[in-house]
Amino acid sequence: MERCVFYISDGTAITAEVLGHAVLSQFPINVTTFTLPFVENAARAQSVCKQINEIYQDTGVRPLVFYSIISLEVREIIQRSEGFCQDIVQALVAPLQGELGVPPQPVLNRTHGLTESNLDKYDARIAAIDYALAHDDGISLRNLDQAQVILLGVSRCGKTPTSLYLAMQFGIRAANYPFIADDMDNLQLPAALKPFQHKLFGLTINPERLAAIREERRENSRYASLRQCRMEVGEVEALFRKNQIRYLNSTNYSVEEISTKILDILGMSRRMF
């Protein structure tokens, strides 16, 4: 089954995307998505409405429309479209208002916008991103005392995307260090990392998956051979066990799942931005 899906917002549309995707993931359908942020006025809403209606006329199937919009005028224009429209925030606001006994006070871009109230959190997240970039792939072993977690693993097992996701999503200062082929003859935990053993977390991966990933980068190379991948993964997992470093097999997990599991295993607090 194929459906067109619109994520519409007067802000970034991140909320509409996240909640809409979470709902649609429950259904066995294929989707073509249109994300339309900053639909802030009637003229823009009319243009979006026209786009929705044209797809309906061309396909005969109503597009699915998930929206998060403060302006009543803009909401009503979207609701008059030929799409199957779901106001994902208002559906929760009404019952919550009854429970809290307090009327909502909607403010444009409050969720993902930059305001005086969240400036400190924003600065902390940017600092975490800068830290992750400066300490990616063992570039620098300085200031590891400032790291909240240090990821270890073979090349291409997911360390870099996980470090950056932890920084961007949760403001976690994450460093990462790779074990490369030249290390394997006498693999040991680097002296610079030993004082921070409580911060170390290992990532591993099935050798077959690792070989496929490396093959895309260096085709027909020793680096990408299954034999090499099996050897490296085996050596690094043995190092993790020897040094009692907690680790996770990343093969079947997304970067979001890997990051969340690391926080859970290490007992680290999540911060929302």
Swiss-Prot record:
Record's Pfam families? Kinase-PPPase
Show the InterPro entries listed in the entry. Kinase-pyrophosphorylase, PSRP, TF_DNA-bd_sf
What are the EC numbers?
Answer: 2.7.11.33, 2.7.4.28
Q: Does the keyword Repeat apply?
A: no
Gene Ontology MF terms in the entry:
ADP binding; ATP binding; DNA binding; phosphotransferase activity, phosphate group as acceptor; protein serine/threonine kinase activity
Catalytic activity, as annotated: [pyruvate, water dikinase] + ADP = [pyruvate, water dikinase]-phosphate + AMP + H(+); [pyruvate, water dikinase]-phosphate + phosphate + H(+) = [pyruvate, water dikinase] + diphosphate
Name of the protein described by the UniProt record: Putative phosphoenolpyruvate synthase regulatory protein
Entry's family note? Belongs to the pyruvate, phosphate/water dikinase regulatory protein family. PSRP subfamily.
Keyword annotations of the record: Kinase, Nucleotide-binding, Serine/threonine-protein kinase, Transferase
Q: What does this protein do?
A: Bifunctional serine/threonine kinase and phosphorylase involved in the regulation of the phosphoenolpyruvate synthase (PEPS) by catalyzing its phosphorylation/dephosphorylation.
Q: Where does ADP bind?
A: 153-160
Q: Which residues form the signal peptide?
A: none
Root EC class: transferase
| BP terms from Gene Ontology | regulation of DNA-templated transcription
